[in-house]
Amino acid sequence: MMKKMISAVLALTAAVIGHAQHWSYNESAADWDPSDFPQTPYEVSGQVHTATVDQAREWYQAMARQFPDRCELVDMGPSDAAWPIQVFVISSESSDPIKVLVNNAIHPGEPEGVDACMLWVRDVLLVEGSSACNQVEYHIVLHYNVGGALNRNSQSRANQAGPEVYGFRGNSQNLDLNRDFIKMDSRNAESFERYFSRFQFDYFIDNHTSNGADYQYALTFFFTHADKLHPALKDHSLSLEATLRQDLFLEGWINAPYVQTRDHSPESGLVGFFETGRYATGYTALHHCIGICVETHMLKPFPQRVKATHAFLVAFSNRMATESMLREFQDLELSLRRSFSSDPWVQAGDYLPIRFELSTVPSDTLDFYGFQHGYRSSAVHGQDRLFYDRNSPQTFPVPYWNHYLAVDSARVPRAYILPRGYSREVLERIGRQRGVSVVGITKDTTMELTVSQLLSMKTSQQPYEGHYLHSQIQTVEYSRPVRLQRGDMLIKVTPENALFLVNVLEPRAPDSYFAWNFFDACLQQKEWFSDYVFEDMAAEWLETQPLVKEELQAKMKANPEWATNAGAVLTWVYQKGPWSEPSVNEIPIYRLY
């Protein structure tokens, strides 16, 4: 028996080693030494490898040593791996600068931003006369997903042309960190939130590689959807996006919105990507920071994708450095400050949208630079498969659906109140947010508050990012006296934090804390009954409640099969009577109007 067990262990070990060897690689070509500075690891490799976590840190340390008065390398905070998230900060000459956060390697298999940022930083700091940072302060995240960046391989990005070696999408918990900004299951997200709140950034750039259709563009990007932005930011965001597209086009970079097709191919039209708070740019928008997601095309050679990302950074920084942008930003900043104080853009009793649906009417028509596509028989499964003919470039008009309509809204309260028992799961997440303060109630009291009762919802049958996400949530709201205990937590709603709080505390919002399972305990009944004990109690109670008894008899007559289920009938009576638990399906998020 022991020999059989040893043989089985050895066989399993061989299988595991065999699988690990499938993700093996040789990175000798990417050797980089600080003596190579100011060349980047990407350049030393012959433009075939992306910088590792160690190489990026050493390169930026060398840059910080050369320009100690202008830049520094700092820790954003811990990650889920053993290494912290690091940020390279280029200071501004202005006392009140525009603040920009650039994020790289949230998906480490999409690493263009890592290398493009090094090239851009070198341009800014080593080229005399650069005005990029005269009025702008840049914070550049080296590798946000440190754990995924350390898990390097050459196989996991099957649809991508290089680099030869790259990181993995999942972090050290196997989480997709670009779905974690509301639920904050990772230490990465906690560190991001603290850093983001501390510096109160005005713009956020998230660098990615696309998946999906084939087309001529190396560069696509989208701005966080204007339909859900603070009104003061909407026009500015739309104007800046249009200006950047034109600037890039004049520099020879044809570009398009992120290519999300309505059907299988671009000819069917494009649909604007709507990011809720789980995504990085969706999260920053909830805090009045304009987010931009850069998506270079997966099938373009890695050097071309790095150049495309670099071109976007150059276009953005050049635009930020103009006097007209400074004046526009100063006006915008003043407008925002007024909307948070003397002229509030939202007040208690107003309604904020929490759920959007795509308009059925196209908002624009785009000239799309694509390839002719067709179908042919698959050599794998024998069915028709899609293919693109890169020898047949085409430009053709496509409809663009990019307008989203609010289909649900929530009334803004003066404050939310949560039981202290939710301090670990919910209150700690809320208390760290920008512009949010949480205070404890000092004594037991009873208040008339508004609560939500769950009517229906759907729950995913498969785990999604460590949760079983709720969707299509329907509730009914009502007021009742609520007994509050000393230590329960009050969260004041202000014009600055209302957008965030409504989107996480209103249960029907798609990325609410309820949707992410933080209140699932309220969905379970805690006390029950023994049939033989409850039979007599139920009969006696029904005799005192003739209307309920009449309702029961009508229900049994209308549903004969149900009437034969004794347990179901007793449960119905139990839930109608004084024994039912009012807390079941009542979501313990209280609103004070």
What positions do the PLM features span?
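Sec-dependent signal peptide recognition
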Residues: M2-A11
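Hydrophobic h-region of N-terminal signal peptides that target proteins for export
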Residues: A11-H19
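Hard-cation-handling environments
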Residues: R262-Q453
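Catalytic centers of hydrolytic enzymes
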Residues: R420, E428-R432, V439, K443, ...
